[in-house]
């Protein structure tokens, strides 16, 4: 029993420490693992203090996702901020292997979209939309956004 309690305590400490690594992290699960072109994914983030932040686009797909890369648009509005930019997220490398972190048949890819961006304290709305020719992207589990202090400041 003491061993279980000790293990649980360690896990809780590690999990609570992870929360301090980012200012905001949001993932939206996609119904039927399909991301339709008109399905804009929206995230509401709060920045607790003005400063420099890195903004990442998060993309989780299932093994079998057929595209080498995916084109997405990130639109971010907040206090004195209006940002609208398209990005290409690499999915499959030149060696024909999936990029990112894989676990069995699930793959997580992240793209640094905004680096050392000064964000003011306050509420932000972030929209992600895919810009692929294909209307419905299959085998997409989740898309998301992470905002964190630049790695050099952590």
Task: Give each language-model segment a name.
Residues 87-117:
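An anionic, turn-rich surface loop/hairpin at beta-sheet edges
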Residues 2-10:
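Sec-dependent signal peptide recognition
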Residues 15-17:
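C-terminal motif of bacterial Sec signal peptides marking the signal peptidase cleavage site
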């Amino acid at each position: 029993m003491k061993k279980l309690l000790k293990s649980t305590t360690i896990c809780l400490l590690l999990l609570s420490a992870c929360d301090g690594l980012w200012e905001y992290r949001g993932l939206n699960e996609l119904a039927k693992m399909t991301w339709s072109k008109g399905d804009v994914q929206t995230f509401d983030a709060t920045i607790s203090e003005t400063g420099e932040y890195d903004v990442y686009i998060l993309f989780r797909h299932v093994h079998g996702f057929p595209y080498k890369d995916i084109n997405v648009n990130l639109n971010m509005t907040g206090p004195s901020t209006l940002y609208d930019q398209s990005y290409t997220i690499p999915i499959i490398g030149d060696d024909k292997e999936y990029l990112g972190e894989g676990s069995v048949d699930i793959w997580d890819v992240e793209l640094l979209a905004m680096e050392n961006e000064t964000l003011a304290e306050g509420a932000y709305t972030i929209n992600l939309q895919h810009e692929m020719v294909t209307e419905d992207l299959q085998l997409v589990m989740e898309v998301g956004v992470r905002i964190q202090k630049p790695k050099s400041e952590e």
